[in-house]
Structures are given as C-alpha cells and as structure tokens.
Amino acid sequence: MQMFETERAKLERNGGSLSIGLLDIDNFKRLNDELGHSAGDEALKALAGTVSKTLRPGDHVARYGGEEFVVLLPETAVGEGEQVLTRLQRSLTNGLFMHKQKQVFVTFSAGVTAYRGAERIEEALERADQALYEAKRTGKNRTCIG
C-alpha cells in the first residue's frame, strides 16, 4: 500500500500519530441477494462517495477487498479516529440511495487502531479487523477500537 508507506515515512521524519480504520458494509450479502449485485455496487459507491466527501484533505481511503475499505487518518489519535468514523457512519445513514425506485438504507461497521511505530501494516490491519468484527458482533453500525 503506497499511501501507507508515504504516511509511515512522514511519521518517521516528523513524529505524530496515524489511525488506521477498516470499514465494512453491514448485511452486504443480504443486500446483494435481495436486490441484486447492482444494488451492492451502488451501496459501495454510496459509501465511497460519503467517505470522500467527509474526510479531510490528507486523509486516505482505498477499497480493501469485497465490501471493505481502509482509511488512513494522519495526525489523528485513535480516539479521534473513532470519532471520524462515527461521523462517517452518521453521514451515510442520513442519506438513502435509490435502487430501481426503491430507497435503500446502508450502514457500515468499523474498526480503528493506532499505528505503532515500526510495525508492519499487516499487524495494524489485523487489529483494525478484529475491532471491526467486534463492532459487527455487538450490533453493527458502530465503531470499535482495536
């Protein structure tokens, strides 16, 4: 992940903090099964659009696979990162998107963690992933810290 390497180099030079979040659309399989894959694609676009509009300049988002996205929040402590992702959740749930003249409500669960010095990105992503699945297990449409 090039954006991670860039942010890690900045951290090594300047210090500071970096929060890493994983987002996963809730009930994505059911959405695809009930409304079709085009609805799933539209949900992914709605989430990506909300994230792009809501994040600060300098924050980064990328599709991570399936219905997951990774978010890098430079100069953001993990508690602030949790607040950023919670704001994203509110922004997404405040807007519905239309699919074949039907309003579709989409939510996502998130996990966020603090990058710890010289660790590999995979280690931070694993913590964020564990926090993401804690959010799913404990009710969905929420953010947990890992």
PLM regions: where:
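Cytosolic catalytic cores of cyclic-nucleotide second-messenger enzymes
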Residues: M1-S17, N27-E75, G79, Q83, ...
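Catalytic core regions of nucleotide second-messenger enzymes
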Residues: R63, G81, L92-F108
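Short, hydrophobic secondary-structure boundary micro-motifs
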Residues: I20, K100-Q101, T143-G146
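Catalytic-core segments of nucleotide cyclases and related cyclic-nucleotide turnover enzymes
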Residues: V78, E82, T86, A114-I145
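Conserved metal-coordinating catalytic motifs of nucleotidyl cyclase and c-di-GMP turnover enzymes
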Residues: G21-D24, G66, A128
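Short catalytic/binding micro-motifs of nucleotide second-messenger systems
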Residues: K10, K53-G58, R90-K102, L132-E134
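Cell-envelope/extracellular polymer assembly enzymes that use nucleotide-activated donors
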Residues: S19, S109
